[in-house]
């Protein structure tokens, strides 16, 4: 899996159709140029972020391969690779940096807004590798969050199962009442890292209740609100537009982690980025 940047934002308005034929020809030419630039940039990104591991992906239990190609499988780093290296391509770095918001009022972020290291994580509540990350790695990062070194910002990439978008909508609904991370913990605690959980409105309401969401009627309404649905759709489309196709995927300051990695690998990456930021 690789990240590839979208076409330059200045090309966003090229979809308008001028009345004059000469203007239409110019528009078509610019679109062709934009597409060629996007292809070249995508090749650069693929080269920059291609995983260095040479082993075949392993499943959560070493005996079962997740069925979805959109999940980023565990790949053992090379013997020399104990952390994710910093990206070097300026264009890729610009994309990575633009994904960080540092919004103090973001209900789906935890950690100080001015923390030296920000991890932007693209995840899916039905992804077994995301479940492994939530169960095994995130608890090992608690001291870094509480100590002010690390901030985590969540992004939805809801695509593993047909009910992944509904679960993502439920996450937003929980966040509207200040209980996103409690909901996140409840969902992943109940998930089996060997499988792909399917969700219903009722099962998500039950999880919201476990997470302490105070107004469950509002939770259900927000979960099904068209604004929430559109937010999840747009988040997934945005991830795809910058080339993120699988989960989990993490941007950690100037580095990127493609797929599940053990806690030591993630902590080493954070430590290196913190030192670089100091």
Identify the function of each model-found stretch.
Residues 2-68, 75-77, 209-278:
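C-terminal cap of thioredoxin/glutaredoxin-like
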Residues 115, 123-125, 131-209:
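Structural alpha/beta surface segment adjacent to cysteine/selenocysteine redox centers
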Residues 109-110, 199, 223, 257:
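Short clusters of hydrophobic/aromatic residues that line enzyme substrate/ligand-binding pockets
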Residues 99-117:
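A short beta-strand-turn-helix
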